[in-house]
């Protein structure tokens, strides 16, 4: 504030000049009265001016020059007019005796200073003889002085300024004339002087004033805020600084005030002064002339708008505004000048080009005249020469060049034409048009030229647009007559003149036409060139515009791809996290919580990328039975080497405990399949030890969820829900454990079987989520476990070949709900149709779409809507659905789940000669293949294909002459889709003769069918013997022990736990006796019976329970179903399970009723009551074993008794603990410390889980007993 306050004072008192001029003693003393320390403030002002690029020092020197000039000019009046001269150096450089040079408030400023310095209140105000409003000015100032008499001397000048500023602010609506005639004062931009607008106008009568203004027109530029203007003022006056300073030092005794007020450089802005107005003057010169200033009309606001005030100070608002306006006006003037110069240059260039073109045209015309003198044309003069432009357009020309001439000359304003004269060639007699224009024709006696009148239709009829510009015929013939009259005296001369006249006309016309043709050709070329250049420029501009657009599009595409990838990753991770959280918060009855692994690492698998190495090591183990331990260690090292930090191969392992139920058909909540592409790296897929279970959640109608599954069209053997064999070989680590146990402990088979059980427990969930990856590794366990068998080289090679053909079923119905298909639609660009399904629950509107993704093996599923119900309850009679899935072709699905099981069974039958004993662990097809009746008396035999069967003492479900459904030729089917959802239950009907009245359905041609018992038996076998295929070869060396132990302990399941035999084998003895042999005997008896069916051919029966429609005394096999219009329940089709029986039936559900329609006659006896009871036991046992054995991965046959189920769970617990011990034994060779810690945590988790499973098994046992009682 202090610096700014000092600048305002110094602008009035010019303290900067006082510091620069050492002779101004009086003014310096007087100024010291205002504020103490004023010199310091002046120094601050100098610094501020330097920062603002104001060169005050240079300006002061320039002003000193002006003072010297003024003194020289006014030597006669120095004593009388010191005050006036001292205050007028900025704008008027000389003073006359009349005091005409008064600039604004400068005449009052001396009075203010004298008032302050001398405190003389009665001093007269100076007069201005030339001003019209002296009285008003004097009164104005006197009134202000009277009001300021009581103020101290140091504050008077501030008060005056403040009051003047307020008066300006109050009078903002004055016009220009009022401002000129009033005493309102304006503010200078730089020094804050108040100038009276009336007294800016200066008379032109003083010659000295006119001479002194030319070199002093500095105006605003003298003290502008820009550096360029200030430097110009200093450079212009540097030559006079030395002399002027000396003069000032000698002559400043009487003129101290002159030097003090020299800095009145700038008072206004060029924007407020017209071109004929002068800028405010600083430097007087004798040769300068003073101009009359005229203010523009934009000075309505003398205060410069809302200028801020602080403590009575006058701001620089108006000064800045005026400066900005002046700069804008200067820039506009410069731009106008530049535009004018450019226009002039362009006009000059155009004129030069026109002149050059005219010269060229003249040259071309002369050359054409010389070249075409020999061509002669005969003119044909017509009566009507002048024609309108409309008639010209209607005329046609025969020559193409002439057409171009007429067309182009019409568009040209300079070259006007007339096509009125037509000429005919002597040779072709073609009509041609030529223009006459304003050319002159000359004729003479000697020069053979005829002069033609310059009068044309154009000159005569300038205002008529319809008349042409050609010459009239009358004028031409008048000249001809005149010439003819002149030459009548000389007939020879007359003849020559006529001939010369004709020749001259012909030559003239021809030269004109040729010249015009050339002009037109030149114009055409120029036009084409310009058009080409313009087209090229446009193309370049378009390319330049398209390049950034293309780049932007590429960048946007890249960003979108990245965003999509990120979104996919986020969605997958969110699904994984959400499902894990939900499972932890709300565990299913059949799915206990999964223990988390602290050693798990993201984006890695337990395998790394060494699946190929694992297979190679397994082959080495098969070839080198004595060195299995070394090979296994190599496998472990391979796992370890794939880790980036060299960590243990189990650092990323996530163990999943054995589950009670993993089948979507029997579980309350099933899991969706996590999509994995077959060609993707293992590092990008879900690790096999950490499968992700995504339970189907209730979905809102606005949202859709998609799941992708993988299927491949391969031959289908027998479609079973059992998928355990495919999942055994995911855990290559446990396979290595099996190798070690087999090689080190040939007599101990418990560890081998236990390890296999652990594989089941880990991989059941993988079976539903990573089926494709699991299916590619199906035969590793077979290779590993067959080390000790002498005949396993063939079986291993066969298994390796069959593993490529094994693919899992990506079941459409595996989401836990029941669906029916209501249509399909072809997809553009794809060979596979899109299938549409609807939930079968009554009132539920949920739909889903299933579609094959491109040429890949993935199916995408899209759900729409939200289920209004829970998961449907599973049926008690599972065989119906199992039979359907085993016999009916799936549309769009590949049911090759059990190919490996079949091949393994067939291949392993070679080793069943030494292993067929009462253990039930034979390698035949089905659990009874190669097994005795449980007493160890049967001898397993083999057919030519390696399929084992029994002699008379051992009954097998695969009889001679029968083909197993698993090996039947019907199982190779194409790829289609279906919805098999509704679950049928039994109906108790005692009728034997039943008919069918429904529509005929498509039949599946099957040469050889199996009995329903065979199917159920195979279901049990698939649950139990998948690991038996892997373990029986290991038991080859222990046949003696197995025979002895099993013969002694047929009924005691737990007596052989301490022996080398498997606990599972002991449990399987009872199962084989109860489930396999007796059923097979009953089935064999049915072939010899006679049919007892009587009655009509067609029978319809209505039942009221959901259980009675299948339990009618016969065994049925479901072969299809169909959706019914207007009903949420489908129609089911069944066929008698006997091979040769033609009886069929249809079942339609209507709310709580079931309508059964039978057709045909049975050609066999009904099954005995014992078989029916055993069949019920099969159903119950299959249901229980599917929930217990599959998820716990027992290698046992399904048990019908609840005690056997509990024993199986106990055995599996022991097996799991043994498997952990085996893992510890192997890993102690490599990373003992790490694996021990990890295994300890796993054991604790498994113990807790197994306790929970035991409780759940007890609950299941109670539920089964209650259901049996109800039945």
From Swiss-Prot:
It holds the Pfam family WRKY. The lineage of its organism: Eukaryota, Amoebozoa, Evosea, Eumycetozoa, Dictyostelia. This is Probable WRKY transcription factor protein 1. Zn(2+) binds at residues 839, 844, 867, 869, 1136, 1141, 1162, 1164. PROSITE patterns: WRKY. Residues 919-937 have a biased composition (Gly residues). It is found in: Nucleus. It comes from Dictyostelium discoideum (Social amoeba). Residues 1-138, 204-312, 370-515, 578-650, 667-811, 890-1095, 1180-1210 are annotated as: Disordered. One of its GO terms (molecular function) is zinc ion binding.
